[in-house]
């Protein structure tokens, strides 16, 4: 049985159970997504945006699915603690794909922000969710999006109303926990109305050594003059596979900051699509990858300048050790009429060993003549002259390499605007390079 067929058969056999444990607004697009998946299947390497990762191989194992929504017997608010110094957040949890609510976080947030289970909110406000759900994540264009849409039953809903400023960072801990190998299909819907301002920190963690396959779709609507900061940290283990698609729509004078940090994983495939639909919109998209052993990390981005006077900045850096593999493909599209566009795309990569591999493909596609756009990429090893200089001053070879690697990724970490998180990442990255870090020391499962 090929990879696609097992999921086609699964949906046909369990459609009623899937729908019964979800919400009508999510179920309304489920059959159309199934038809799209039947037609598209998994994207092959012949598809330009998937040329560096063999997707169908990732979905071959027979993972379990929690279709009947059996609750994992853990209270994350009692079992989990985040001890990042000076980081004050309003804390929420998603266990696998089930949102866990507690009473205390709401007390830390102003009126005008909703953080809730996507399925529960859709049952109470079906028209609102139907207006936004699966509108940016088009199932007829991407097989992964179609698969997630046909199987996802719950996730996270964030709604920030007009002119509401959320000073406290909203932290969402995605915990993977299961006694058996598990597939998790998670959805996140973020709606920022005009003038809204909020910051979100998503942290991925595995609480055990089971093998996980996670598909995640994030749809974010950023209204006029709104500001969204989205920080995503992956700290799982080598048996974890994560396929994540993020779709963002920005209106006039909006601002979007996206920072993705991969410190531990097995296979990670991230897709980021940002559509600049209103004049004056700005986005900053940054990524830091530290990989070793046989890790594989693939970041694929599209910045779509649809109107004039928009700005985009991209900076992705990789440090690859052992037999790890990295890939970056970034496309900047400047459409007809998108004059006065300013865009900069940079991908810099460091292969610490001869067996590490990096594939890079920055792309500019411009159909306007009054623009200022640049792109570039580099792949190399540590500078021998710099190493020699440091060795001559009594620094050991190991310490010299560590200092150079740390300085290399420091530029990306410094883009993080949350100062406590930025300081913590400086510490974590240094320990990661020293081989002393197997997981985020600030995040602890309490026995």
Give, region by region, the residue ranges found by the protein language model.
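Conserved beta-strand/loop scaffold segments within soluble protein domains that form the structured core
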Residues: 111, 121-395, 409, 413-447
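Short, low-to-moderate order helix/coil transition modules at the start of elongated helical scaffolds
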Residues: 1-217, 225-227
């Amino acid at each position: 049985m090929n990879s696609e067929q097992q999921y086609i058969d699964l949906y046909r056999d369990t459609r009623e159970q899937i729908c019964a444990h979800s919400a009508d607004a999510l179920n309304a697009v489920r059959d159309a997504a199934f038809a799209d998946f039947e037609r598209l299947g998994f994207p092959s390497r012949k598809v330009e945006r998937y040329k560096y990762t063999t997707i169908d191989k990732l979905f071959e194992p027979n993972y379990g699915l929690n279709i009947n929504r059996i609750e994992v017997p853990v209270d994350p608010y009692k079992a989990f603690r985040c001890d990042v110094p000076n980081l004050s957040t309003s804390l929420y949890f998603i266990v696998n794909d089930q949102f866990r609510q507690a009473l205390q976080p709401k007390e830390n947030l102003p009126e005008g922000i909703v953080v809730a289970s996507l399925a529960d909110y859709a049952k109470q406000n079906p028209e609102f969710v139907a207006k936004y759900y699966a509108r940016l994540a088009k199932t007829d264009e991407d097989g992964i999006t179609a698969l997630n849409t046909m199987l996802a039953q719950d996730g996270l809903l964030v709604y920030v109303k007009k002119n509401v400023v959320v000073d406290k960072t909203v932290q969402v801990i995605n915990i993977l926990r299961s006694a058996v190998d598990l597939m998790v299909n998670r959805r996140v819907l973020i709606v920022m109305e005009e003038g809204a301002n909020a910051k979100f920190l998503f942290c991925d963690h595995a609480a055990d050594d089971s093998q996980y396959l996670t598909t995640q779709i994030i749809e974010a609507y950023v209204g006029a003059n709104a500001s969204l900061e989205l920080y995503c940290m992956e700290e799982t283990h080598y048996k974890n596979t994560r396929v994540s698609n993020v779709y963002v729509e920005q209106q006039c004078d909006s601002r979007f900051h996206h920072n993705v940090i991969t410190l531990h994983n097995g296979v990670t495939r991230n897709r980021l699509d940002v559509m600049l639909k209103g004049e004056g919109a700005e986005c900053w998209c940054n990524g830091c990858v530290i990989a070793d052993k046989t890790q594989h990390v693939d970041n694929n981005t599209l910045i779509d300048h649809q109107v004039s006077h928009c700005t985009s900045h991209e900076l992705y850096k990789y440090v690859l050790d052992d037999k790890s593999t990295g890939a970056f493909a970034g496309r900047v599209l400047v459409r007809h009429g998108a004059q006065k566009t300013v865009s900069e795309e940079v991908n810099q990569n460091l292969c610490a060993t001869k067996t590490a591999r990096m594939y890079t493909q920055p792309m500019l596609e411009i159909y306007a003549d009054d623009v200022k756009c640049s792109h570039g990429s580099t792949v190399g090893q540590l500078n021998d002259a710099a190493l020699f200089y440091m060795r001559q001053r009594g620094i050991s070879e190991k310490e010299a390499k560590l200092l150079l690697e740390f300085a290399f990724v420091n530029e990306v970490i410094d883009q993080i605007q949350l100062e406590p998180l930025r300081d913590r990442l400086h510490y974590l990255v240094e320990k990661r390079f020293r081989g002393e870090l197997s997981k985020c020391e600030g995040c602890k499962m309490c026995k």
